[in-house]
């Protein structure tokens, strides 16, 4: 495991961590019951099987 040679300041640590950004999931169109919904790709199978409500309610 990599170990730093010296202590990193709090401001450097926080500025390094702030570079990470969350990304919006890519949405895919799925037709369920005659209605088309846009859901994340990882939930397509669950929506088709009826395990997840595509309306999100």
From Swiss-Prot:
| Gene Ontology annotations for the cellular component aspect, listed alphabetically | large ribosomal subunit
Annotated region Disordered: the residues are: 1-22
Is Ribosomal protein one of the keywords?
A: yes
Under Gene Ontology molecular function, one entry of this record is: structural constituent of ribosome
Q: Any idea which UniProt keywords this protein has? A: Ribonucleoprotein, Ribosomal protein
Q: Name one Pfam family in it.
A: Ribosomal_L32p
Per the record, where are the segments of Basic residues compositional bias? Answer: 1-19
Q: Which domain of life is it from?
A: Bacteria
GO BP field: translation
Q: Does the keyword Ribosomal protein apply?
A: yes
The similarity comment for this entry is: Belongs to the bacterial ribosomal protein bL32 family.
Name of this protein: Large ribosomal subunit protein bL32
Organism for this UniProt entry: Rhodococcus jostii (strain RHA1)
At the highest ranks, the source species' classification is: Bacteria, Bacillati, Actinomycetota, Actinomycetes, Mycobacteriales
């Amino acid at each position: 495991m990599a170990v730093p040679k010296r202590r990193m300041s709090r401001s450097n640590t926080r500025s390094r961590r702030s570079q990470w950004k969350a990304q919006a999931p890519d949405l895919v169109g799925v037709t369920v019951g005659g209605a088309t919904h846009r859901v994340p790709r990882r939930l397509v199978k669950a929506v088709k099987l009826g395990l997840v409500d595509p309306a999100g309610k």
